[in-house]
């Protein structure tokens, strides 16, 4: 068969375009499955993943994302169902285009006029939830009062989308839209648009997370989501996932030599080697059914654990065991539930929350201490409701704890003999588990939203913040935005140098 020269050229061009498109679509970048330019862009974009730093750089051109046509660069993965997208992002350099933009986007397809929802941050600070409900229709938007946030979250719940933003350190502000009806799989990812067909812009992204939340049929403590063990620099907020497993991993403690993390899972304890990134079973003899309240002594020689009593009748009692492992020694009396949270700096005392017969309320737990070698327990608090999370300061002058006595769960402290109980926080959130840095300068806690969680509860699988404040007093600052809760940071998790913390975040890993 004979072809004309012009026909051969046309076929070659078509073939080349198909190859470029295929390569663009199939290029895996970090957690994303592919990337492509959407629309008729003049300058090809790109997305690069730095695995060492767990960061993304996305370059994009394109005239706009507006009216009935979009032009931008998109790094994406296909998903279905509900999800939570979260990132911290910023543009590289300055630009003459006030409306260059980046953010999260969910699209029905990769064509230029697809139905879509975008959590959009513009170069001049304009922040908006933009959406096109049907293909070939104009984009609509819901603007925020916040200008230029760097933390961006987009959540899908059925046909509802919720955009939440914050300047790092602050709590989220949200907007939402409903009646967004996508069919089947959608394209989910990060985008950059130059807002100028002749220009190219670049944005950097860190702490990129795609979370699949718990379904409505999940029964707490019967079924669990997967877990990420993460570490974070508390000053910069930079996070890194060290280990992931489709199981409930909880409450990592940093060992005093800085070499391992100790966590619990499925009733046992594990040591996670920070060099090899491999866990190994920590031997606890006949003691099983260990929960997430375990604490390493200040000198690093002993471990306190909370586990079912030897007779199996009490769900949690306190034991001690050498950090080399062995047969634990029962410390607390068999009078009711006891959950360990702290050692005294000299190693002579353990402090814990316990339920005894003198408080008939369901959540009636008070703070106690007991000699670490065993002996008579001493009650330190005695109020209705829940006192929890007692932890000694490194100088031994205070025991920090959280209490619901003022209405919401707030942070408190007292002298080691129970005197001079004073409230440290008083905000519109539920703040749990005050963890004091080894240098005594900082307090980190986990914060639950009062609209999602009762003050005396700290359940799995919720939107939570990790927040930090000076130990000398001051406002709480958000240092992490995550999906977690129970098991995230129940017990001390500071690195020995007071620069980092370890914690657990959650997502469904069943598929």
Located regions from the model:
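Bacterial Sec-dependent N-terminal signal peptides
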Residues: 1-28
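Compositionally biased, intrinsically disordered low-complexity segments enriched
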Residues: 22-25, 37, 110, 132, ...
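Extracellular glycan-recognition regions
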Residues: 27-218
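Sequence signature of WD/YWTD-type beta-propeller architectures
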Residues: 214-511
């Amino acid at each position: 068969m004979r072809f004309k020269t012009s026909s051969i050229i046309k076929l070659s061009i078509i073939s080349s375009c198909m190859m470029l498109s295929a390569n663009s679509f199939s290029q895996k970048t970090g957690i994303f499955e592919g990337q492509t330019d959407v629309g008729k862009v003049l300058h090809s974009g790109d997305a690069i993943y730095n695995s060492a730093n767990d960061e993304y750089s996305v370059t994009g051109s394109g005239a706009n994302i507006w009216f009935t046509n979009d032009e931008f660069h998109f790094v994406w993965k296909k998903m279905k169902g509900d999800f939570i997208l979260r990132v911290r992002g910023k543009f590289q350099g300055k630009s003459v285009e006030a409306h260059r933009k980046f953010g999260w986007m969910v699209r029905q397809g990769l064509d230029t006029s697809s139905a879509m929802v975008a959590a959009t941050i513009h170069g001049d600070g304009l922040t908006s939830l933009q959406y096109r409900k049907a293909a070939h229709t104009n984009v609509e938007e819901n603007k925020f009062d916040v200008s230029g946030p760097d933390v961006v979250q987009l959540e899908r719940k059925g046909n509802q989308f919720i955009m939440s933003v914050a300047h790092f350190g602050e709590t989220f502000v949200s907007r939402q839209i409903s009646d967004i009806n996508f069919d089947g799989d959608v394209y989910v990812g990060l985008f950059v648009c130059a807002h100028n067909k002749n220009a190219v812009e670049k944005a950097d992204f860190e702490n990129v997370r795609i979370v699949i939340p718990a379904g409505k049929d999940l029964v707490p403590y019967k079924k669990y989501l997967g877990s990420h063990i993460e570490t974070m620099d508390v000053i910069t907020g930079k996070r890194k996932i060290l280990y992931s497993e489709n199981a409930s991993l909880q409450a990592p403690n940093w060992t005093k030599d800085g070499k391992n993390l100790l966590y619990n899972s499925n009733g046992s304890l594990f040591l996670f080697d920070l060099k090899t990134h491999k866990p190994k079973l920590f031997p606890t003899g006949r003691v099983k059914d260990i929960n997430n309240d375990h604490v390493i002594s200040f000198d690093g020689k002993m471990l306190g654990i909370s586990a079912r009593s030897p007779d199996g009748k009490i769900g949690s009692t306190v034991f001690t065991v050498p950090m080399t492992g062995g047969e634990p020694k029962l410390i607390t009396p068999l009078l009711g539930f006891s959950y360990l949270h702290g050692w005294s700096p000299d190693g002579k005392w353990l402090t814990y929350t316990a339920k005894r017969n003198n408080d008939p309320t369901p959540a009636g737990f008070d703070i106690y201490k007991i000699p670490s070698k065993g002996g008579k327990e001493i009650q330190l608090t005695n109020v209705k409701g829940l006192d929890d999370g007692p932890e000694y300061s490194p100088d031994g002058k205070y025991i920090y704890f959280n209490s619901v006595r003022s209405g919401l769960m707030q942070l408190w402290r007292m002298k080691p003999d129970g005197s001079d109980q004073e409230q440290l926080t008083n905000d519109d959130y539920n703040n749990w588990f005050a963890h004091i840095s080894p240098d005594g300068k900082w307090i980190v806690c986990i914060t639950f939203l009062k609209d999602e969680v009762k003050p005396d509860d700290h359940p799995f699988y919720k939107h939570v913040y990790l927040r930090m404040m000076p130990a000398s007093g001051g406002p709480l600052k958000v240092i992490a935005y995550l999906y977690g809760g129970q098991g995230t940071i129940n017990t001390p998790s500071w690195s020995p140098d007071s620069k980092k913390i370890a914690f657990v975040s959650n997502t469904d890993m069943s598929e």
